[in-house]
């Protein structure tokens, strides 16, 4: 499938392309085989200044996700560095906890949206490198919607909204009064990562808190340790927070983030929005029988989201990744994901030393992975590790953005009757032969069946929207899996795969939340942990606070020919 892409304004495209001299996947030779290096060492460097120093002196070879203009300019000036730029499926946002008063009031969230000066933020913090965004899908998405309700920067309008709704200023405290209680509003906080880990995010929290204080809202920034922050978000113990999503081509992220069924502990509906009209539209998107029906539902859902503001979206950033071109080549820029993101299989497979073969590439990890459990991992830092250990049934061609066969050599999409008069989707996967788990166990259709049923039966929040409609999985033979959904949807093809779990490891795991497979030795194979994948790299060592080391999978089914 190839989704229609929204064309960014030509002027912006030209300016950014000229600024970075970026290359595209079509200009880079890439192969569907690898990996070309013997190991990846991922030094954990949280401090932004230390990251830049390490890259410039050659201590790291891959510096992903640059955001600070000063860092970008320093890298551009380094004759041994190459900076790639790709428009991203990226969205930076302020999230409100709509379960808590007073942030359950639409007016309050709309007023806060009015005091956020996107243009000034982008100019002062990013020197114009980011793209202002108010919509709930980025411009690189084929489902981006431009014409939505907006709350442009206008502090005076924010004051008028609050005054008209009864949030008048208490003369004694200078704080606005909650019309429900007649008392000054309680103090509210904006969680962000720390300045050391994400300086621009922390600074944005401060800027927005100060803008809110200027209209008499008692809001303060609260930078904190990132793993602690994630724990609080999972438990809905927050007022507001600022983070970014790295999305995909598929617009059902709207369902995952905003449908009421996903308002559960550790679920993706972190704002806790519950809106019957919105739910109906999101279900129309999720179960759309065609791209046309999906687009209509997505458009209408985005209008409601823009009006209600469970998030206030600030900007979308191009992915800017730096590589030491004096030492490595073979990195593949990819629309929507960049050249260094874990979703980009092609750089992982194709990166190689300029001289010689094999060797070690040092790939920066900007934050400590909290967990290396595929059922509970949620941050990009965790998946930067895990994403290189697993393969999927399909991959994305980096030039055309079309689906291409991977572990599945082919597939069919059909229908069946879950009950008389009702139509459901059935996906039939035909697997490649010879694929093995990293402990040499053959990968078969039974692994697909076990994984999908385990995720469904255990209601794993990270995957619940993918598996909740699965009725059964059949395995006619070792290389054929048939996944039956109780409903019909254009998108079920993308829910019938995923990060598969080895049954002999996971069948006895009763509590996936507390399972720490990276800390437990494999029961039979020395040197392996219970994090067992089938991808190009094996988890070799994780030394907390120092590094993660991945080694080349010697039995990878796509080894270079």
Regions found by a protein language model. Give the residues of each.
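N-terminal lobe/hinge region of extracytoplasmic solute-binding protein
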Residues: 364-420, 532
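Surface-exposed binding/hinge segments that line
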Residues: 4-7, 114, 326, 464-517, ...
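Ligand/substrate-recognition segments at binding pockets and active sites
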Residues: 168-247, 291, 356-359, 363-371, ...
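Long beta-strand-rich cores associated with HINT superfamily self-processing modules
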Residues: 323-360
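Aromatic-rich, solvent-exposed beta-strand/loop patch
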Residues: 21-50, 71-90, 168-173, 177-187, ...
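Append "and occasionally in soluble cytosolic enzymes with long acidic Gly/Pro-rich linkers
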Residues: 26-30, 104-210, 274, 293, ...
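Acidic-aromatic pocket-rim loops
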Residues: 82, 90, 228-287, 333, ...
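Extracytoplasmic/peripheral linker and loop segments enriched in polar/acidic and small residues
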Residues: 122, 214, 218-229, 256-324, ...
């Amino acid at each position: 499938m190839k989704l229609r892409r929204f064309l960014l304004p030509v002027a912006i495209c030209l300016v950014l392309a000229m600024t970075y001299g970026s290359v595209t996947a079509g200009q880079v030779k890439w192969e569907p085989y690898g990996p070309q290096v013997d190991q990846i060492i991922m030094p954990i460097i949280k401090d932004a200044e230390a990251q830049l120093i390490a890259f410039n002196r050659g201590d790291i070879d891959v510096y992903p996700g640059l955001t600070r203009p000063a860092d970008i300019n320093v890298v551009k000036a380094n004759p041994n560095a190459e900076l790639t730029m790709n428009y991203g499926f990226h969205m930076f946002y302020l999230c409100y906890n709509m379960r808590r008063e007073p942030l359950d009031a639409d007016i309050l969230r709309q007023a806060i949206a009015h005091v956020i000066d996107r243009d000034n933020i982008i100019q002062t913090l990013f020197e114009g490198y980011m793209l202002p965004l108010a919509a709930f899908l980025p411009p690189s998405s084929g489902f981006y919607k431009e014409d939505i309700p907006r709350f442009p920067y206008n502090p005076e309008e924010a004051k008028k909204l609050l005054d008209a709704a009864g949030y008048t200023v208490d003369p004694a405290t200078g704080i606005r009064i909650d019309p429900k209680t007649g008392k000054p509003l309680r103090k509210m906080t904006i969680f962000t990562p720390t300045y050391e880990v994400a300086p621009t995010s922390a600074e944005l929290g401060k800027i927005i808190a100060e803008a809110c204080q200027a209209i008499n809202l008692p809001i303060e920034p609260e930078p904190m340790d990132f793993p602690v922050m994630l724990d609080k978000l999972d438990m809905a113990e927050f007022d507001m927070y600022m983070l970014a999503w790295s999305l995909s081509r598929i617009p059902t992220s709207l369902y995952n983030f905003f449908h009421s069924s996903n308002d559960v502990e550790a679920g993706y509906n972190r704002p806790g929005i519950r809106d019957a009209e919105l739910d109906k539209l999101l279900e129309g998107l999720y179960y759309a029988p065609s791209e046309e029906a999906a687009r209509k539902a997505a458009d209408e859902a985005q209008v409601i989201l823009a009006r209600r503001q469970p998030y206030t979206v600030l900007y979308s950033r191009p992915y800017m990744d730096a590589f030491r071109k004096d030492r490595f080549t073979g990195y593949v820029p990819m629309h929507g994901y960049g050249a260094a993101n874990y979703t980009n299989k092609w750089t992982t497979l194709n990166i190689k030393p300029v001289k010689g073969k094999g060797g070690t590439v040092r790939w920066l990890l900007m934050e400590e992975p909290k967990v290396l459990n595929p059922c509970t991992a949620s941050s990009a830092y965790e998946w930067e590790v895990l994403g290189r250990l697993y393969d999927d049934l399909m991959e994305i061609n980096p030039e055309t953005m079309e689906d291409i066969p991977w572990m599945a050599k082919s597939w069919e999409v059909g229908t069946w009757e879950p009950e008389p008069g009702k139509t459901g989707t059935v996906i039939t996967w035909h697997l490649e032969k010879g694929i093995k788990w990293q402990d040499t166990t053959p990968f078969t259709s039974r692994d697909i069946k076990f994984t999908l049923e385990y995720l469904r039966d255990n209601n794993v929040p990270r995957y619940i929207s993918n598996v909740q409609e699965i009725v059964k999985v059949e395995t006619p033979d070792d290389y054929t899996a048939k996944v039956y959904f109780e409903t019909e949807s254009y998108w079920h093809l993308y829910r019938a795969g995923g990060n598969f779990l080895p049954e002999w490891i996971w069948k006895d795991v009763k509590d996936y939340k507390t399972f720490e497979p990276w800390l437990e030795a494999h029961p039979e194979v020395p040197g392996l942990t219970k994090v067992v994948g089938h991808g190009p790299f094996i988890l070799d060592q994780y030394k907390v606070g120092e590094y993660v080391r991945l080694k080349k999978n010697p039995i990878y089914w796509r080894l270079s020919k």
